[in-house]
């Protein structure tokens, strides 16, 4: 089974935010964790913003950076192609999504075509993005 984890889920784990333990527990049931290749940009940006805002100890900030490196190292990167970019543009308009949210959906949808929805679950944490995910046939991994 494949878990497509969009970048806010990865950030949730790296920053140890509310819900990260449930997410990590659910991901244990999957063989592979996948994210769009640009997810590292969002993940790093979220962490940098969090560090600036909360001003943790240098040691804790370093542990967050190390967590990001480990999460990204163990995540399979799904490459962007022109078809995904075009699909994402359409998803932005149809579902009123932010660009990266739509790109994650397009990536997950393209992966679903390869492995089928029976063998893949979507892990997203934005309400509008999740509604769009269900509408295009993705199955929510946070729902039993």
Regions found by a protein language model. Name each.
Residues 1, 30-33, 74-76, 116-121:
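Short active-site oxyanion
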Residues 1-40, 50-63, 144:
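Short, well-structured N-terminal submotif of metal-dependent ribonuclease cores
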Residues 2, 106, 110-144:
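Acidic, PIN/NYN-like endoribonuclease modules and their adjacent C-terminal/linker elements
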Residues 8, 44, 48, 89-92, ...:
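Amphipathic alpha-helical segments within well-ordered protein domains
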Residues 14, 18-21, 49-50, 67, ...:
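Noncatalytic, solvent-exposed loop/strand surfaces
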Residues 39-40, 70-95, 102-107:
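Acidic catalytic patch
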Residues 49-81:
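Helix-adjacent hinge/juxtasegments
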């Amino acid at each position: 089974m494949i878990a497509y984890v969009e970048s806010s889920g990865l950030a949730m784990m790296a920053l140890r935010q509310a819900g990260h333990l449930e997410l990590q527990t659910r991901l244990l049931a999957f063989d592979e964790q996948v994210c769009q290749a640009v997810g590292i940009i969002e993940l790093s940006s979220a962490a940098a913003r969090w560090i600036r805002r909360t001003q943790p100890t240098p040691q804790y900030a370093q542990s967050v950076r190390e967590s990001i490196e480990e999460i990204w190292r163990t995540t399979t990167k799904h490459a962007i192609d022109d078809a995904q970019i075009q699909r994402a543009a359409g998803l932005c308009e149809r579902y009123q999504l932010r660009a990266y949210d739509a790109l994650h959906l397009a990536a997950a949808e393209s992966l679903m075509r390869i492995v089928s929805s029976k063998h893949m679950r979507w892990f997203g944490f934005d309400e509008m993005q999740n509604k769009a995910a269900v509408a295009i046939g993705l199955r929510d991994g946070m729902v039993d």
